Amino acid sequence: MELMGMSSTKYGGLEKFNRTLMEKSPQNKFIFVYVEDPMCQQYVDDMTTGNSAIEVISNKSVIRYCFSVICLILKFRPHIVHFHFGDEKMLLAPFIKVFFPWIRQITTFHSECVLHSLKAKIKCGLYCRCQSKIVAVSKGVQKEIAAFYDNKKLVTSYLGVECDVSKNKEEARRILEIPMKPIILTTIGFDVATKGFDVLVDAVAQMVNKFTPPLFIVNVVGLSKARKEQFMGIVREKHVESYFMSMGIRNDINTILSASDIYIQPSRTEAISLAIMEALHHGLPVVASNVGGIPEVVIDGKNGLLVNACDAEGLAMAMLDLMQSPEKRKEMGERSRKHSLNFNVEKGVENLIDIYEKKGVISNKS
């Protein structure tokens, strides 16, 4: 049972990972539990056939959510409960440990895990003690967890991504109705503050006010309608509307990346970025914040440039550097494509199945 602890707004990298996991392990039954109905019908169709099913439990009430999960456990009798997102897992894990001791628990830390208070460290440490295996999505996150829970149960496993790179830039821009001349800088994220989109706006404002960059457009992808309005308000405050476009939540990320020249990830915090992994597969150079697991996917000076989080001036200079040098973009893009081989979805799924089966979490005959 995969307790996602989140909603699914698109057919994104994590959704594709789940589908591949289901396909590569046909001998096992997977129950994916979300807090809202997934928004992409194609994903629902793909995940409700064969050995997979989707259940939806609202998390508006923590107690009701936990009770509903327990009901699902009684209904499906899973061999394993795999926690992903959501604070509710802190309550569920010890309950399952006591009342369903035959169930093996696994947790994946998809976010950075920097705990500042002793209380938070003790709470998270107790949660980790309930787990059979603790999976960090990057070495950076593993290091953060090891600061308060250094244990042999802790491993790093990259998720990896699936990419369709069949479209060339001309075809992709024609489909998206984007002109060929501008340099397209793309960034993908669900939240303005977490993903540092406000810093990106500040960086663009500084760049166009101090320099004369080549013709460019920044394409912001992944914001809901409300967050898109919030973001465009920041853009208007800086008077840089002509340099931005916002496509909202999309399922055609491969086409968008095929149409792009540079990928930007100015996050304040980031365990590791599936969007960057996708950009690497498309041969894009990357400008990103030097936080969390990002340095594992962006090698500074090789396939991209790293800047300090919230450093608008540094971000502006890095973007300008790549925009002014087509040759550097090409060289870094080629290195990105080679580096992307380390972040293949099938490899990530194989690692997780190995954790499930080899470590005795589930039998490959169950």
Language-model-detected regions and their locations in the chain:
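Conserved donor-binding/catalytic core segment of Leloir-type glycosyltransferases
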Residues: 1-3, 179-195, 201-204, 219
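N-terminal strand-loop element at the rim of the active site
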Residues: 4-64, 226-227
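Glycosyltransferase donor-sugar binding loop
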Residues: 32-40, 161, 188, 215-230
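Short His-centered aromatic/hydrophobic patch
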Residues: 83-91, 109
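Nucleotide-activated donor-binding/catalytic signature segment of Leloir-type glycosyltransferases, i.e.
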Residues: 231-248
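Aromatic "clamp/platform" in nucleotide-sugar-dependent glycosyltransferases that forms part
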Residues: 249, 268
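Short hydrophobic beta-strand element within catalytic cores of glycosyltransferases
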Residues: 285-288, 298
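Conserved acidic donor-binding segment of nucleotide-sugar-dependent glycosyltransferases
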Residues: 300-301, 305-312, 321-326, 341
